[in-house]
């Protein structure tokens, strides 16, 4: 495992209020998606009917991004209204879809290490079988926190 040094989502998104919903793994997924869209020369118009297939990890290492729980109770002073969004597996896909203008099928796959590959396979099948003409597929996860 190698650390990701100096990762700053703002470099990819600029001012972007949805950033507060993302855990580190979801931020990596969003950055990768934006890189893929820009690198592929795709526009929001081209992606409007595209599908989105995102693989995510199981969030087993919740690091310091989630409220401290002691004796089955959350420390209320550390809980903000949106904390649950950083834990839900489909938050990354939702934010990617909004950022890229994708309004087609949206699927989140949570099969641990194989999640991104499973997402890519699902996108391939949808295109091969004629359900979609275009899809963005991949994943993101993080087991380490800075």
Regions found by a protein language model. Name each.
Residues 29, 51-55:
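Short, conserved beta-strand segments within well-ordered enzyme catalytic domains
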Residues 1-42, 85, 89-103:
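A glycine- and small-residue-enriched flexible loop/hinge segment at structural boundaries
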Residues 38-49, 57-146:
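Acyl-thioester C-C bond-transforming condensing/cleaving domain
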């Amino acid at each position: 495992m190698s650390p990701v040094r100096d990762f700053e989502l703002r470099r990819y998104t600029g001012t972007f209020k949805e950033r507060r919903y993302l855990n580190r793994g979801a931020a990596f997924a969003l950055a990768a998606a934006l890189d893929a869209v820009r690198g592929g020369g795709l526009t929001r118009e081209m992606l409007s009917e595209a599908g989105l297939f995102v693989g995510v990890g199981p969030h087993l290492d919740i690091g310091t991004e989630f409220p401290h729980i002691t004796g089955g109770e959350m420390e209320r002073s550390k809980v903000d209204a949106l904390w649950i969004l950083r834990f839900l597996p489909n938050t990354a896909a939702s934010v990617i879809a909004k950022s890229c203008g994708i309004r087609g099928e949206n699927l989140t796959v949570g099969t641990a290490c194989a999640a991104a590959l499973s997402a890519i396979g699902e996108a391939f099948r949808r295109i091969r079988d004629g359900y979609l003409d275009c899809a963005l597929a991949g994943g993101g996860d993080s087991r380490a926190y800075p």
